Amino acid sequence: MFGVAKPPPSPIPKPPRGRHFGEKYPESVNFPSRGARQRASTRHRPSIKEVWEPPAPPGAGMIFWGENGENGDFGQSAPSCYERRRARSQGGQGAENAAPVLRPGPEGRRRRESLIFLEGDMVRETATVAPWTVSPLRPERPKSLLGRFRSRLTVWREVPRTPGPVAPIPELPGEADDPPTRTPPPPPDD
């Protein structure tokens, strides 16, 4: 009956207008305007399809996702965004580096996804190895030493170049096609 007059309700406290919120998108933080989205997307970001389905060089292999090679499994077996950018950046350094060469790993529980980059006669293979897979660097290494989580291994090995037309072997000195080094003796007179 003898109530005290309530103070006027205070306005809802607003979040601090920081550098990354109020100054850039004052009207909506989480949903920037269309113009802001267009300005932010001026730099081309390649999609997964652009990176993983380039025109393959001759002799390129396949890519196996999933336990037995099912495509479309972009879970743990998918490479990270950093790896995709690295594959894109290293893919344009030469004719044979036009695209990352993707090879299938062993099927079954010894599955391994690999990214392979051609570098001259050598290949750098960055493999995501499941914890139950033995190390390709030391096959005698016990499986338990790889730990519980997936490991990153970089393997260097020599590989033959892409098969192509074989260049003819040059003739060595002293072959039949070479000019004679001295004049033959005259035939005997009868």
Curated annotation (Swiss-Prot):
It comes from the Viruses. Residues 1-15, 162-171, 181-190 have a biased composition (Pro residues). Residues 36-46 have a biased composition (Basic residues). Residues 1-110, 160-190 are annotated as: Disordered. This is Protein E6C.
